[in-house]
Regions:
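Short N-terminal segments immediately surrounding and downstream of signal-peptide cleavage
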Residues: 19-40
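Short N-proximal segments of mature Sec-exported proteins
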Residues: 42-106
């Protein structure tokens, strides 16, 4: 029993250290170009438009996660629920745009599933980078976007994009 308890404690500590190292690494390697570069072209270029929906989905999803895990808000907090809804709406929209505008196909279950497989890894990668940046901000001055003008602008643009698309 004692060995099982020691093993459990070591496993939890290693997992936490891995998670912290991963977050630090994500914060260091934040290399996303400003969202404004894509916003300018999004009305006339479908690739720029899908990039906006993927990036916005990722930013809003990672913001919800950061509010919960870094700021300690409960998962049923209205702010988190709103961000999660916008994240999922934009994520689903990315899949549909990918099928209809990028591939030029009529939406059905099969090509929707293929789109999820192609698009979701990008969203996950963006979420990792955004969360890393949010985590770095939180470590530096206990804020998420309050002192980060780029994330403020991108969050504002993403909420506006969601409002226009719904």
């Amino acid at each position: 029993m004692r060995y099982a308890l020691i093993f459990l404690i070591l496993t939890v500590n290693f997992a936490r250290a891995d998670d912290e190292n991963f977050t630090r690494k994500a914060a260091k390697h934040y290399n996303l170009t400003p969202l404004s570069d894509y916003l300018q072209d999004a009305s006339s270029n479908t690739h720029a438009f899908i990039e906006v929906t993927k990036r916005c989905s990722a930013l809003l999803g990672s913001s919800a996660w950061a509010l919960s895990h870094l700021n300690g808000l409960s998962d049923d907090d209205p702010q988190i629920l709103d961000l999660d809804t916008m994240y999922e709406d934009l994520r689903q929209f990315s899949f549909r745009v990918h099928v209809q505008a990028i591939r030029g196909e009529k939406l059905n279950r099969d090509n929707y599933t293929e789109s999820v497989i192609e698009v979701d890894p990008d969203i996950h990668d963006y979420q990792t980078q955004y969360f890393g940046r949010l985590h770095r901000n939180h470590d530096k001055d206990a804020t998420l976007i309050e002192n980060d003008l780029l994330l403020q602008d991108e969050t504002f643009a993403c909420i506006g994009t969601h409002e226009q698309l719904r």
